[in-house]
Regions:
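Helix-helix packing/entry segments at the starts of transmembrane helices
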Residues: 19-20, 44, 103-109, 178-199, ...
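Transmembrane alpha-helical segments that form core, pore/gating elements
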Residues: 27-30, 53, 114-116, 120, ...
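C-terminal-most transmembrane helix of multi-pass membrane proteins
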Residues: 46, 146-147, 218-220, 252-321
């Protein structure tokens, strides 16, 4: 059993790995646009993840959980898979119009969509502090993208921003459906079922034959996209073992900053100049990014505090009964 210091260091390590790999992912996805369409690449990522995770779950002997699922559980599982397919595919598509850092920052509206989903479907409450953070995310987005307002004629960027919102909304619906399945399946089995479902459903719409003509560099990029899916989610799951959910969520909110830094490093070293370019963000845009990240972190902190208060209020009632 690790002590408190080891627990903190393990949590920090796995959270950092998660942020690093999620920060690198949009760069790799943008590079993949030169040799693969978003649907085919997403199909490949799901297929590789399904094989790796399937072998892992089979070795652990936990596949028997699926035998206990009812019809409505399977329907929820397939619906969650459909939303995750939309999430993966649309985010990859958005990178045809946005820089990696901008796409990751735009995705920070996901907590708002998740909260609204909880409000409408799970009857959860959003307090005024959370609403204030959501307003902060919106204001930060406007400040970050302020050069676009000044330039005008940047319709493709707004189109990309809209695609990211679709991706974030789809991810939020996936997260809500996944939450409803936690009592029936382990999170790893939920992901496995979704990966296999996506592998089958997306095959008619993808062109795997196009992957056979990839160059050596293209193969490395595609392989990284696939392995990234496994490593990032694996590190995220491990981080959740050692840190509280709010700590992990707050650290993951730094992903846009990581994506921005990595993009600028690629530009500084002259890597992939045909695909990766600098955002040329000014001080005001960087301030907008800071507002978005700070607001996203505060949403997690406030939500955790609300949950703790609710648990403390419920405890005396339970003891009284």
């Amino acid at each position: 059993m690790p002590n408190a210091k080891q627990t903190f260091l393990y949590g920090l390590f796995f959270s950092s790995i998660t942020v690093l790999f999620w920060g690198m992912l949009p760069i790799a996805l943008k590079l993949s646009g030169g040799f693969s369409d978003p649907i085919t690449l997403t199909w490949l990522r799901f297929s590789v993840a399904a094989v790796i995770l399937g072998l892992w779950q089979w070795q652990r002997g936990v596949l028997g959980e699926f035998k206990a699922l009812a019809r409505k559980d399977w329907l929820r599982l397939f619906a969650a898979g459909t939303f995750l397919i939309v999430n993966y595919t649309s985010f990859a598509w958005s990178l045809n119009f946005l820089l990696p850092g901008s796409a990751q920052l735009s995705f920070q509206v996901a907590p708002l969509f998740l909260a609204l989903g909880g409000l409408f479907f799970l009857k959860e409450v959003i307090n005024w502090q959370q609403w204030l953070c959501f307003v902060g995310i919106g204001v930060g987005m406007l400040v970050f993208f302020h050069p676009i307002f000044a330039q005008g004629g940047q319709g493709s960027i707004w189109f990309g921003f809209g695609i990211v919102q679709l991706s974030a909304a789809a991810w939020s619906m996936y997260a809500l459906l996944q939450k409803s399945l936690f009592k029936r399946l382990a999170p790893s089995n939920i992901l496995l079922a979704i990966y296999v479902y996506a592998l089958v459903v997306m095959l008619p719409f993808s062109t795997p034959s196009a992957l056979l003509s990839m160059s050596a560099d293209d193969i490395w990029i595609a392989a990284f996209c696939c392995i990234n899916t496994v490593i990032a989610y694996g590190a995220f799951a491990q981080a959740m073992r050692y840190w509280q959910t709010v700590q992990v969520s707050a650290s993951v909110a730094l992903t846009p900053v990581m994506a921005f830094i990595l993009t600028e490093l690629c530009v500084a070293f002259g890597w992939w100049t045909d695909s990766i370019s600098s955002s040329h963000a000014d001080i005001l845009s960087l301030f907008g990014m800071l507002i978005v990240v700070a607001s996203a972190i505060n949403v997690q902190l406030i939500s955790a505090r609300v949950q703790r208060k609710a648990a403390l209020l419920a405890k005396p009632l339970t003891e009284a009964v």
